[in-house]
Swiss-Prot record:
InterPro entries the record matches: P-loop_NTPase (IPR027417), UTP25 (IPR010678), UTP25_C (IPR053939), UTP25_NTPase-like (IPR053940)
Positions with biased composition (Acidic residues): 59-74
Residue ranges, annotated region (Disordered): 29-74
Record lineage: Eukaryota, Fungi, Dikarya, Ascomycota, Taphrinomycotina
GO biological process: maturation of SSU-rRNA from tricistronic rRNA transcript (SSU-rRNA, 5.8S rRNA, LSU-rRNA)
Annotated family: Belongs to the UTP25 family.
GO MF, one annotated term: rRNA binding
Keywords attached to this entry: Nucleus, Ribonucleoprotein, Ribosome biogenesis, rRNA processing
Protein name in the entry: U3 small nucleolar RNA-associated protein 25
Taxonomic source organism: Schizosaccharomyces pombe (strain 972 / ATCC 24843) (Fission yeast)
Coiled coil: none
Annotated gene: utp25
Amino acid sequence: MAIESDLDGASMDELAGKSYEALLYLMNKNKKRKPEKKDDKEKSSKKVQKKNKVIESLNEMEVEMEDENENENDEQEAIQYYINVESQDADETLHQEAQDSSEDPFHQHFDYDDSEVIKNSIAAYDEGKLCKSIEESKLGVSQSFFPDVTKRLPCSCLSEIKNIDDLGLKQRILDSYKKQKPSGQLTSMQIELAKAMFNYQDVFFTNMSMKSHKLGTSLLALHALNHVFKTRDRVLKNSARISQNPELEFRDQGYTRPKVLILLPTRNSAFEFINLLISYSGTNQVENRKRFDNEFSIEKEVISEKKPEDFRYLFSGNTDDMFRLGVKFTRKTVKLFSQFYNSDIIVASPLGLRLAIGNKGDKKRDLDYLSSIEIAMVDQAHALVMQNWEHIECIFDELNGLPKEAHGCDFSRVRPWYLDQQARYMRQTILFSQYNNLDINSFFSHYMSNIAGKVKFRSLLHGVLNRLGYKVTQTFVRISVDSIIKVPDARFSYFTGSILVQLKKYSQSGILVYIPSYFDFVRVRNYMDEEGINYSAISEYSSVSDMTRARNLFYQGRTNIMLYTERAHHFRRFDFRGVKAVVMYGPPTNPQFYVELVRMPMRTISEGNLDSDAAKCRIMYTKFDSICLEGIVGYQRVSNMCHGKHEVFEFL
C-alpha cells in the first residue's frame, strides 16, 4: 500500500524504520486521494452471480450488526476460560508453554525478534541475493531458496515427520483428524510437503495430479486451522494474564484479526475446503450452515460424463467464481459468513475479493482486514490463470499494508515487524497448481518473499507425445526472437508470412488454429477480416449461439479455418468435427490440451474424411515458451529445442 507521509517530509523508507512515527501517522492521518480513472468492469453471463451478489450484500449488512454484539461476548467468555485454566496451575502452564515454544515452528517463526537478522534477510531478498539448492524428493525435484545471509530464521524443527502426530497440531485438531483416519498415517507426498509447509516456508507445488491435490488440500486445511487456533490461544491466554496483572507486556498480535487468506476458483472448491475445516475443527456447532449449503452447493450434478476427467474435477458442483466469506472459530462453534474484521479465515475467489477491495483512489475503499494476513493460500492456480490473474496480483499488492484505521487494535501488543512494515516478508504463501506457466512462475519470484525460505516442488515431466494414441506428424518450429517484448510481433509475422500464405495458396479446409492469448486472437482475427479470408472463430467471449454456428460452418466446410482460444477450450473443452490439421500459435499452457487438440483429426479419420497418414500438426514456439514446452515434449528435450542450433523438430 502506498503511503503519502506528512511526517516532516519523511520518505517511505524512513517511515518504515520508525515504528513510533508510523503509529502516530496511522492514528492521526486524514488522507484524501484523487480517484484514478480505470475501467475495471466485470461482466458475468450467469444469472446466479447477480443473484448471489444481491443476497451477499444484504446478508453482510445483517451479519456485521450481529458480529459487533457477539464478538465482545465471545472474547470475554474465552478470556475468563483461560483465567480459570491459568489459576489452576500457573507455574506448570508457563513451563509447558516455554518448552512448546522452543520446539514449535509457529513460535520460532512469528515470535522471532532479532531485528538485525530480519532486516538483513529482507535486504538480501530485495537485492536478489538468494542461496539455491536442488534435491531429488518424493515429489520429483525440490528447489529451495533462502536469503544469502550469515544468520537466518530457524526453519528445520520439523525435519523428521512420520505421521500426523509429528506436525505439532493442536490436540482438538489431532483428535478430529484421527476420528476420520485412526492410523494417522501420511503419504510420502504429504510428508515431503509438510516439512516445508509446517515449518512456515513458502511452498509452490506444481504438476499436481488430482489425487495429490486432494491430499495437499487436506494438509492446507490442517495447517490453516492449526495456525488460527495457536494464534487465538496465545492471544487469549495473554489477555487473561494481563487482566490479572496489567503490568505484563506481550507482543503477540497483528493489527486485525484475520490471519489466513484462501483464494479458490469456484464456490464448489470453497464448499469442499470449508467442509474440511469444519470436520477438523472439533466442533459440531456451525452457524449459518443452511445458508452456506444453499449458496455454495447444487442439488444435482449436470456436467457431462464425456468431458475429460480433469475438467469434471475442476467444474463439478457450483462453478460460480464470484464469492467471499469470513470464517470465525470460537471454543465451541464455527461461524460462517462472519464479518471480515471478526473472522479468522477469509475464503474468497480472486474476483470476489477484488470487487470488495475496490480500486486505488476509491473514497470508501476498505481493505484493512488484509493487513495482518500471516498465511496466504492460492489453490488451483492453473484455474485462476484462466479467470483473470491480474486479480491475484492486485490482492497481493494490498496484503500486509498499514491499515487506515485502528479497528480497536492494542498497539502495545503488535509485533515489531508489523510496525516496521516487514509483515509481507514474514507471511507464508502457499501455491498449488496443476501446471506452471509464465504468470505463475513470475508470482513465485515476485510475491513469495518469506525470509524463512521458499521451496518449489515439481515433477520431472516426460511429456505427452506418447499419449496421443495414433501416429500424427507434429512439427515444432522455433521462432527466433531475442526479447520477450518482441514475441507477439514475431509470432504474428511468422504466422501471416508463412503459415497463412500456404493455407490461402492451397485452399485447404479443416484447419484448426489454436491461439493461447486472447490479444493474439484479436490481432489474427482482424488481419483475416482485412484479407477477406473465410474463417470461423470461437473465444471465451463468444455466445452459445455463435459457438454453435461457428462449429457447424466449420464442420460443413463452409469455412476453412477455425480460430480457437485457449480460455475457450479451458471452459468448454470442445472436440471439433471436421478437423484435418492443427496449427498452434503457441504451445498450450496445459499439456493435456495438447493431447486433446492433436487427437481431433482422429475423429475425421474415423469418419472416412481423412487418410490416416494425412493428419498434420504444426506448433510455433520461442525460447521463452520453455515452461509450457517442457510439459509437452519432456524435460530431456526442452533445452535443446529452445537453445540448440536447429529450429525445426519433427515427431511422429
